């Protein structure tokens, strides 16, 4: 059997009076109960005769339902039982089906419990609809008053002709002096019909966890990895804004025009640059250097660049054709060399623009400066706006903020994982870094969708603003 992983807290109050309380829950998980306890500070409740024992105590019993459920013509009776088995903790009336406004939901549940605990059962449907509880309170087992007086487990006519058989077992007895809590280890399968009841003076509180097999959790994580990774924003808590008016924000940050319009008079001066551009390839120098974050985070920019490349090929093909051009003819040239000076080899310019990559380790975080920003450095207490892409060591992206409103947080105040507070400190506006954050400075042994436990995380970050 695969190990079980806790996913949520389970709690259940079982009041005294031998009232059957179902353990069933709408939560799709196995229930693992680890503690039973009573509150010794509460006043004890008297029994039916008004007696209170010298040593108040409560006995917890578990009642297991066996047998099979089938359809029944008595819809109202079936509604009562479904309300009981489906978890009667809700204070709202069940939706659908007939109901008697003179009865509260509690009265309905008590009627269903009496049917479960009834000692006799009639054979025909009419007799079952007209039958009333005989008032005898069993302790989990009883005798059915059949013609042959055959002994059987305590039964409930929840589904017409078939019976719901109940078997009870004592779990523990608690008192208010010494034994007011008891560690237990009870696992209830998903969909299993189990009840609890208490005989005594105090309510018993059961606590534990909802658990699922670890294999199921891993399968769920794999499915989530295959989905759109941009839906998650776990390390930082910010959300991507995909509005159209913000989609070109990164282009505005570059401050460099993508297209320049020139006339045929200027073509002779620009011709050497066009030849140099064709030799260098399709990428702009700004995208060539060190593969910064801008080259990775904007799919829209990449698509636009391809269109520009196609236009460039068309223009170059037209130039090669023997055609006379007038001064009024205009051509579109991409501003791939706008940053180059009027003189000097273009190759030297490109080499000078390549930033030097500086790698250092600060408090366990590996910091690789891909691009140095301008202005003052960010310090603790500053509110910073960031773009980022988060990846695992295998290259799988689990989170990102590529466009829209930048992710904003206060540096050094614990609003993000520790590795971010360390790695972002010292950046200037426009700066880009690659942060390699070990597990103990990220999420440790916790597992998140897309992030296995004990994972080293890699973030490519860019600082957009300091407030």
Swiss-Prot record:
Record keyword Zinc present: no
Functional summary from the UniProt entry: PPIase that acts as a histone chaperone. Histone proline isomerase that increases the rate of cis-trans isomerization at prolines on the histone H3 N-terminal tail. Proline isomerization influences H3 methylation thereby regulating gene expression.
Family membership: Belongs to the FKBP-type PPIase family. FKBP3/4 subfamily.
Subunit architecture: Binds to histones H3 and H4.
Ranges for region Disordered: 64-163, 208-357
Record-linked InterPro entries: NPL (IPR041232), PPIase_dom_sf (IPR046357), PPIase_FKBP_dom (IPR001179), PPIase_Fpr3/Fpr4-like (IPR023566)
Acidic residues composition-biased segments: 71-80, 147-163, 213-254
Subcellular location: Nucleus
Compositional bias ranges of the Basic and acidic residues kind: 271-287, 312-332
Top EC class, one word: isomerase
Regulation: Inhibited by both FK506 and rapamycin.
Recorded catalytic activity of this chain's protein: [protein]-peptidylproline (omega=180) = [protein]-peptidylproline (omega=0)
A Gene Ontology molecular function term of the record: peptidyl-prolyl cis-trans isomerase activity
EC number, UniProt record: 5.2.1.8
This protein's name: FK506-binding protein 4
Primary localization class, coarse: nucleus
Keyword tags: Chaperone, Isomerase, Nucleus, Rotamase
GO cellular component: chromatin; nucleolus
Source species, domain of life: Eukaryota
All copies of domain PPIase FKBP-type, residue ranges: 381-467
Gene3D superfamilies documented for this protein: 3.10.50.40, Nucleoplasmin core domain
């Amino acid at each position: 059997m695969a190990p079980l992983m806790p996913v949520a807290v389970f709690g259940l109050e079982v009041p005294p009076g031998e009232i059957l309380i179902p353990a069933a829950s709408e939560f799709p998980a196995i229930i693992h109960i680890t503690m039973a306890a009573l509150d010794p500070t509460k006043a004890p409740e008297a029994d039916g005769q008004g007696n209170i024992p010298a040593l108040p105590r409560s006995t917890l019993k578990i009642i297991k339902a066996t047998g099979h459920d089938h359809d029944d013509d008595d819809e109202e009776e079936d509604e009562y039982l479904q309300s009981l088995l489906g978890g009667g903790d809700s204070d709202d009336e069940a939706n659908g089906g007939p109901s008697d406004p003179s009865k509260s939901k509690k009265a309905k549940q008590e009627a269903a419990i009496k049917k479960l605990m009834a000692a006799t059962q009639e054979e025909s449907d009419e007799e079952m609809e007209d039958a009333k509880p005989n008032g005898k309170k069993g302790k989990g087992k009883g005798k059915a008053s059949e013609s042959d007086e055959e002994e059987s487990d305590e039964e409930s006519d929840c589904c017409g002709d078939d019976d719901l058989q109940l078997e009870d077992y004592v779990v523990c007895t608690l008192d208010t002096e010494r034994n007011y809590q008891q560690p237990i280890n009870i696992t209830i399968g998903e969909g299993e019909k189990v009840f609890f009841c208490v005989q005594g003076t105090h309510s018993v509180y059961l606590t534990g966890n909802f658990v699922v097999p670890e294999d199921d959790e891993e399968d769920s994580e794999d499915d989530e990895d295959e989905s759109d990774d941009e839906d998650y924003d776990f390390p930082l808590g910010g959300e991507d804004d995909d509005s159209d008016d913000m989609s070109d924000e990164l282009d505005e940050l570059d401050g460099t025009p993508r297209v320049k319009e020139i006339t045929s008079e200027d073509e002779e001066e620009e011709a050497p640059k066009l030849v140099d551009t064709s030799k260098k390839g399709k990428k702009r120098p700004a995208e060539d250097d060190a593969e910064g974050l801008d080259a990775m985070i904007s799919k829209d920019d990449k698509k636009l660049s391809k269109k520009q490349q196609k236009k460039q090929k068309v223009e170059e093909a037209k130039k090669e054709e023997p055609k006379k051009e007038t001064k009024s003819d205009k051509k579109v040239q991409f501003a791939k060399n706008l940053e180059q000076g009027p003189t000097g080899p273009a190759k030297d310019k490109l080499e000078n623009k390549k930033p030097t990559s500086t790698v250092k380790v600060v408090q366990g975080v590996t910091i690789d400066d891909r691009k140095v920003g301008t202005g003052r450095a960010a310090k603790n207490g500053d509110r910073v706006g960031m773009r980022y892409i988060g990846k695992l060591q295998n290259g799988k992206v689990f989170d990102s903020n590529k466009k829209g409103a930048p992710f904003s947080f206060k540096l050094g105040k614990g609003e993000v994982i520790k590795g971010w507070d360390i790695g972002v400190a010292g950046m200037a506006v426009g700066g880009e870094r690659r942060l390699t954050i070990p597990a103990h400075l990220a999420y440790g042994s916790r597992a998140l969708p897309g992030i296995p436990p004990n994972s080293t995380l890699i973030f490519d970050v860019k600082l957009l603003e300091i407030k």
